Amino acid sequence: SNAGFNGKTSRQATDLAIAEFDHLSAGDAPFYLWVQYFDPHVNYIPDADAPFQGSLQKDLYYQDVWQTDRELGRLFRHLEMSGFFEQGNLVLTADHGELLGERGAYGHAFWLDEEVLRVPMLIRSPLLPAAEVDLRVSTVDLLATLTELTTGKSLVTDGRSLLPIAR
């Protein structure tokens, strides 16, 4: 199931995700829920209550990141209250970073700088211990990782399972 994107704000994406999660989790079948937050993308249109002020691109970006973080917190609290984390797996990552004036560059489409390539990847599962791992991995590894995490089986792909690192 898919919630977010298509012009939805972070608040709207979270509302959709919570409603869809509640619907899917009421059944007995395993499910996959994809939530995409699009606020921290050009054109930056922050909420009026964002704590950062200013009109520069970097200020507007940080305001959008703040409101997305706020909405992720709301979603995670809902998941926590539902008991999801006792049995469910959660992955949080990003498609790319952003240059905000570093070395005079803006955007992400034409550069391979650290600010563009380095994105967060969080995997939370009742099957894994809490840990922080500072290694270069790739989002291409997610398919093999999630397959092994949910089925116990290895999958031959371009990526590799990250479970040996996480355990």
At which residue positions do the language-model features occur?
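Catalytic domains that recognize anionic headgroups
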Residues: S1-R167
